[in-house]
Amino acid sequence: GPVDVKLEFVLYRKNVTLAELEAMGQQQLLSLPTNAELNVEIMANGVLLGNGELVQMNDTLGVEIHEWLS
């Protein structure tokens, strides 16, 4: 039968200390680097497959694929 693959679209990764994590509260804003939306990692089952760009598609968001890694 069909094989399921879990896709993830990663916008940004940031390391924080446990103290910083514990200090975060609801509705707190976390800043992203400039142009983070231009480099979205496309992962399948935890493996990096390629990258793309976050784009507006009418009333929703999507990822435009720029490159598949071999």
For each feature predicted by the language model, list its residue ranges.
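N-terminal auxiliary interaction/assembly segments of multi-subunit proteins
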Residues: 1-70
